[in-house]
Amino acid sequence: MAERDLAVAILAAGKGTRMRSQLPKVLHKLGSLSLIERLLRTVLTLKPQRCLVIVGYEQEQVRRALQEYPVEFVEQAQQLGTGHAVQQLLPVLENFQGDLLVVNGDVPLLRAETLQALLERHRQVQPDVTLLSAQVADPYGYGRVFCDAQQRILELVEERDCTPAQRQNRRINSGVYCFHWPALARVLPRLGRNNAQQEYYLTEAVKLLDTAIALDAEDAREIVGINDRRQLAQAYQILQDRLKEAWMEAGVTFVDPDSVSLEETVELAPDVVIEPQTHLRGVCRIGPRTRLGPGSWIESSTIGSDCHILYSVVSHSQIGDRVWVGPYAHVRPHSQIGDGCRIGNFVEIKNAQIGSHTNAAHLAYLGDAKLGSQVNIGAGTIIANYDGQQKHFTEIGDRSKTGANSVLVAPLKIGSDVTIAAGSTIPARYPVPDDCLVIARAYPVVKPGWRPGSAAAGRPQPLPTGSLRVYPLRLLPGQDLKQELERFARQQPLQAGFVLSAVGSLSQATLRLADQTEDYLLSERLEILALSGSLCPDGVHLHLAVADAQGRTWGGHLRPGCLIYTTAEIVLADSLEYRFSRQPDPATGYLELHIEKVAEATPPSPQRADGTGVGIPSCPP
């Protein structure tokens, strides 16, 4: 068998009118690769000395798409047929003495084994041309090949030029030829355009050559050309069938092959089971006995052995052995999940490292995080990783647990053996040491008669404790102590209010003593020592004690004109068992406190953080 140099010419100048697209036909995708890329990767396995791509329509797009491949581009400015395309090679291959393999750019399913067989047959027999043909059930749309018993070509007829009798021939021309270039170069200038399309046919060159033979492809499916979207879809199905048949022979189960798709870059171990409606894209490696689907999307990810990915999306991530994912989980890019983990329904993981035997069984978001081993994530746990400007990182130690509906505000580091109580919000940068319980809750608030925009909206709200409602307040510099307390008592309204504690400072104080008609003013900075009395919507009756810089104390009825210097931190309480009002008292002549017993209240009775009794639960500062 004579060894000669090999050049390859790929015809890629046509528009592909029937594709109804602005994209050149050869750049349409078949799976992850364009038609011409698939073909080019196949022909390059033959190791040709030169690989020539003939371009025309939207040639800049084709040049850009193939810029990483070792090819030469030859322009066909006018698209006047396949023969005209090959004529453009005459100056390019002027001194070439080897063989030329000519392939249409829209035949992406050709296998390297078939082209190698064509090349070997051509070099063994040494005709001027060897044509790749095939026997098909439906030859419509293809040119026909007529041969004698020795496979010498007698006639080639294009579909549009066939007589009714010739159309009955089921042997078709694939458009793949192996020419001896010196012989082809002699006849190319003699091509004519005497046909229905007024084009230069390459088949005309075959007729002009002295010796021409045909070789049938073993699998007619691989010479399918792509002229429209229907044929593109059919070619995709052929590609999928080819891939799945190979994997089934290697020990992989496809429960419903027709509903599954995958790419050539996928690697499947023996005893993998692919359930219906599952799709694999990119570079994927799936370990033994793993079950994918039903209804899963796996992209560019590595999944270990004995896993189950159920109705879920896994993208650009790594999953260990014996991991359960789903249903309806989303493992986003740059995530690593350790052995024995469970990522359950409606759990989203992004850029996270999950230690072994960690569970997030349902309804959680774990983003930009590192979780240790044997961590348990309660339902509704959210890592709040974005502050509106940048993402922050969260770390959770081994064996820690989060209760239901917890929010972890990043950046945050939680130690090992930590329990986060249900409903807790852990603020950013809050130190959480090893081996502790953390409770950080907001307690229920009831606003009777509240509606959006009503007077009740926006008021400070109480923390329930026994039969009391507790209101912590802070007054700001310049505010009037009495006026602010009167306003607060009216707006709540306080039912039977009184002062629990008060600390702070005043820039001045106005007080009045009993039986006095005039106030006295202290115009200096003063510390609040005590504030006591009652509050209700009708008014307040409060006494104030203050001290000056020399330690002298002053006291009396609180009057308007007590102005806050730096702050006043006041805790008020409101009894749910009584109702206060201020009514005229004939004996004193003043508005005095009137006390009324109301129906016994039964508010919630929260326990202390240690669970030993009733009181205000302890929370982190």
Curated annotation (Swiss-Prot):
This is Bifunctional protein GlmU. UDP-N-acetyl-alpha-D-glucosamine binds at residues 11-14, 25, 76, 81-82, 143, 158, 173, 227, 332, 350, 365, 376. The active site is at H362 (proton acceptor). Catalyzes the last two sequential reactions in the de novo biosynthetic pathway for UDP-N-acetylglucosamine (UDP-GlcNAc). The C-terminal domain catalyzes the transfer of acetyl group from acetyl coenzyme A to glucosamine-1-phosphate (GlcN-1-P) to produce N-acetylglucosamine-1-phosphate (GlcNAc-1-P), which is converted into UDP-GlcNAc by the transfer of uridine 5-monophosphate (from uridine 5-triphosphate), a reaction catalyzed by the N-terminal domain. Its EC number is 2.7.7.23, 2.3.1.157. It holds the Pfam family NTP_transf_3. Residues 601-621 are annotated as: Disordered. GO terms for biological process: cell morphogenesis; cell wall organization; lipid A biosynthetic process; peptidoglycan biosynthetic process; regulation of cell shape; UDP-N-acetylglucosamine biosynthetic process. Mg(2+) binds at D106, N227. Residues 251-621 are annotated as: N-acetyltransferase. It is found in: Cytoplasm. In the N-terminal section; belongs to the N-acetylglucosamine-1-phosphate uridyltransferase family. In the C-terminal section; belongs to the transferase hexapeptide repeat family. It catalyses: alpha-D-glucosamine 1-phosphate + acetyl-CoA = N-acetyl-alpha-D-glucosamine 1-phosphate + CoA + H(+); N-acetyl-alpha-D-glucosamine 1-phosphate + UTP + H(+) = UDP-N-acetyl-alpha-D-glucosamine + diphosphate. Pathway: Nucleotide-sugar biosynthesis; UDP-N-acetyl-alpha-D-glucosamine biosynthesis; N-acetyl-alpha-D-glucosamine 1-phosphate from alpha-D-glucosamine 6-phosphate (route II): step 2/2; Nucleotide-sugar biosynthesis; UDP-N-acetyl-alpha-D-glucosamine biosynthesis; UDP-N-acetyl-alpha-D-glucosamine from N-acetyl-alpha-D-glucosamine 1-phosphate: step 1/1; Bacterial outer membrane biogenesis; LPS lipid A biosynthesis. GO terms for molecular function: glucosamine-1-phosphate N-acetyltransferase activity; magnesium ion binding; structural constituent of carboxysome shell; UDP-N-acetylglucosamine diphosphorylase activity. The keyword Repeat applies. The lineage of its organism: Bacteria, Bacillati, Cyanobacteriota, Cyanophyceae, Synechococcales. Residues 1-229 are annotated as: Pyrophosphorylase. Residues 230-250 are annotated as: Linker. It comes from Synechococcus sp. (strain JA-3-3Ab). Keywords: Acyltransferase, Cell shape, Cell wall biogenesis/degradation, Cytoplasm, Magnesium, Metal-binding, Multifunctional enzyme, Nucleotidyltransferase, Peptidoglycan synthesis, Repeat, Transferase. Acetyl-CoA binds at A379, N385, Y386, A422, R441. Binds 1 Mg(2+) ion per subunit. The keyword Oxidoreductase does not apply. Homotrimer. SUPFAM superfamilies: AF0104/ALDC/Ptd012-like, Nucleotide-diphospho-sugar transferases, Trimeric LpxA-like enzymes. PROSITE patterns: PPC (PS51742). The gene is glmU.
